[in-house]
Amino acid sequence: VSAYFHSGEKDTPKQEAKMAHLPRIGTRMAELIAEEAAGGISSLVCGDFNVVRSEADIKNWKPNHNKRAGVLDEEIAFLNQWVVEGWRDAVRDLAGDVQGPYSWWSWRGQAFVNNAGWRIDYQYATPALGERARSFAIGRADEYAERFSDHAPVSVTYEI
């Protein structure tokens, strides 16, 4: 499943729409987990979620936490609840308890040069598939001028 959650803007109708959409996504994700548990197919939900899961997922936590969309506790709670319900955050599982790895950097300032990024692009795997994740790569450009997007591709290799 390819997913895009718009970024929202704190205290605006856009953010209200985002917050109304997250429970609907959670309902579908619960259906996919149940399907795998019943012997059905495994699933992968991946894409730009526009939300960090924790302090490890953003270089500048303190100035952003609960001040900007994507770093609000109520958004973070949804992503973490999906993990509690059984989804595997493949990159975090493979990377371990480290800062980053980031997949998005603002075009403004020196964010890319200073690696002041956010980890907001995910691969959430159902449990059986998540156990088969073997490696990951973030396709970060070597130089600012080589960037084709403010995001870098996130790849995970699964042994199937």
Show where each model-derived region lies.
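Active-site regions of metal-assisted phosphoester/phosphodiester hydrolases
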Residues: V1-I160
